[in-house]
Amino acid sequence: MLWFKNILVYRLNKEIALSMDELEQQLASLAFTPCSSQDMTKTGWVSPMGDRGEALIHVAGKQVMMCARKEDKILPATVIKQALQDKVEKLEGEQGRKLKKTEKATLKDEVVHTLLPRAFSKFSQTFIWLDLDKQLVIVDSGSAKRAEDNLALLRKTLGSLPVVPLNFNESVESKMTQWVRSGELPAGFTLMDEAELKAVLEEGGVIRCKKQELVSDEIATHIEAGKFVTKLSLDWEDRLQFMLCDDGSIKRIKFSDTLREQNDDIDKADFAQRFDADFVLMTGELSALIERVIEVLGGEAE
């Protein structure tokens, strides 16, 4: 199973009123199909278990996993430009005149259609986890745009998806700055050795620290000068490490070896059973972490 590396968390404002069978059917209506010769991009649902599964959702209790696949045809701008230039020069030579802007635009479309069947494909996939117990949608992505694109696919699939990014009562950057300044963290959390500090004003600069003692005079000087901590590496309960960001996203998640080895007693040949056990383990850990992060940031804003 692919363990999540980055998560963006969204609040469901209305329960998804579908049974799991109905959800499976809805996803099947937008199952992934490869690009045809004239498609630039295609997106759809595939099994979270990849080629080893057929179901488009994986369910464990009230936790549901889905996977969106995207295919993009790669046509470098330089290739299009050169092919267009060759065609324009040929036509202008034959007709003895300069082509109009609209004519060049039409030619460009023709060039793209001609090149598309020979273009390479780039594939990507994004996992989406529905926590129907806590009414959260968690996207395995560090990019807000990519997350929103995949939520748009889910919204199209379901007909409606009223979600908003998780918001907190306290400022994330103010809280992280307080932790670094004081060296005192909430129970269960430990400072690691990486952070990013930014000044409120853009011209104030950015400081990125790696392998750095964060509770130090050097870092304190930057904070006193008006910089805020915008990214902070943390350890939680010796079970996982991550980077907390000022937008509330949790990135570069690394589960401890001890945690990941908990299901090693399951025969690796039994892919489905191991996938399910790892899914239960991962969602349980991340669900507890999300709940704790909400708590230490003053609760969820209404």
Swiss-Prot record:
GO terms for cellular component: bacterial nucleoid; cytoplasm. Its main location: cytoplasm. One of its GO terms (molecular function) is double-stranded DNA binding. InterPro entries: RdgC (IPR007476). It comes from the Bacteria. It is found in: Cytoplasm, Nucleoid. May be involved in recombination. PANTHER family: RECOMBINATION-ASSOCIATED PROTEIN RDGC (PTHR38103:SF1). This is Recombination-associated protein RdgC.
